Amino acid sequence: MRRCTLDDLDSIMELQQHISDTMTNPDLFVSTDRSDNRDYLISPNAIFGVYDGDRLAAYGSIIFSNDAPENLGWDLAWNREKLFHTATLDTIVVDPDYRGHGLQRRLTRECLSYARELLPGCNVLTTVSPYNEHSLRNVRAEGFEIQKRLMKYGGHERYILGNIPDPGREYPDFVPSSQAVSLPVENILQNPELPTGCESVALTMVLNYYGHRLAKTEIADRYLLKDPENFVTRFKGDPHDISGDGIYAPGLTETARRFLSEQNAPQKATDLTGTPLSELYPYLDRKIPVIVYDSVYLKTPVDVAEYITDGETWHFYHNEHCIVLCGYDPLNRRVLVSDALSGLVWREEQRFTEIYDALGRMAVVIL
């Protein structure tokens, strides 16, 4: 058994397709698409494979989805603090030729061990069809207990099972300290109109903070320049389309300037790219929110494209996300963001900073 890499993605997809093709009851198994399996190969997520020579005989995936919608804890009405202490045993797949050798249980144990090495004491959730007696028996033998029965994955009946090391542990909602700074930035959710329009929505939130009463799609429709390749000074694709990519700080700054100039507004937009996160806090102290680039649900960004402009190479990252930094708590080391996907959320400063740095410390301020 070994941890799989991106080089193993094709064999993972081939084995999954083989399982799907040979299932006598298709309701028992729901395939994972290629982009998701690719994400599962990126740390902190992991896929472990059992090999017979070069042949993939079985694999299991463990993922840390934080507070993303796919976290099964939402189905159990868990709060955000508990979600961040929860991993998902997403899939265990065993080639029919290798069944009967205990591979499902071995992979389950490996995934549990890995999850708790990264996040000691974490809860691990998984789903199994009520009619898949073999899988139910195996996961329950590894300490999983049924939490709920419901419909998932587009109409498939499932149990949610949990391996919960401390059922009595409480996860109180975060309460900021008396030293916390919090600005009243009204949140706007980008969906369903702008599935990839987080940047224009973040800009809209800040402009509305200054008294401009913009509708959700106005910036995206009237002021955002678009291009099929350029994500640095233009929006690559269409923010109304799920396949759109995004626009980086230089382009978003120019978008803001176009709007402010047309309105004869007193504010000016400035690109602060390169500024350490801690050096943005003085703006918050002055009641000035800052647009920053991080990732969706604090997921690991994955370099997927590049674009050269003015001799400089820029990299675009899958999971890139643009939000409004509108508060911080120096005692609890949290930052408050107005997130077009999650709403107003306190994020852990350390992880937020790691991703902010990885994306090039992109930030835009209007003042």
Regions found by a protein language model. Name each.
Residues 1-14, 25:
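A short beta-loop-alpha structural element at the N-terminal edge
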Residues 25-53, 61:
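Active-site rim helix/loop that mediates acceptor-substrate recognition in acyltransferases
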Residues 59-91:
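Conserved acyl-donor/pantetheine-binding loop and adjacent beta-alpha core of acyl/acetyltransferases
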Residues 94, 100-113, 137, 141:
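Conserved acetyl-CoA-binding loop-helix of GNAT-fold acetyltransferases
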Residues 115-128:
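Conserved GNAT acetyl-CoA-binding A-motif
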Residues 120, 130-149:
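Conserved active-site alpha-helix within GNAT-family acetyltransferase domains
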Residues 170-258, 262, 296, 303-307, ...:
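Active-site-adjacent structural segments surrounding the nucleophilic cysteine of cysteine proteases
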Residues 298-300, 304-319, 323-367:
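Noncatalytic regulatory segments and standalone regulatory/sensor domains
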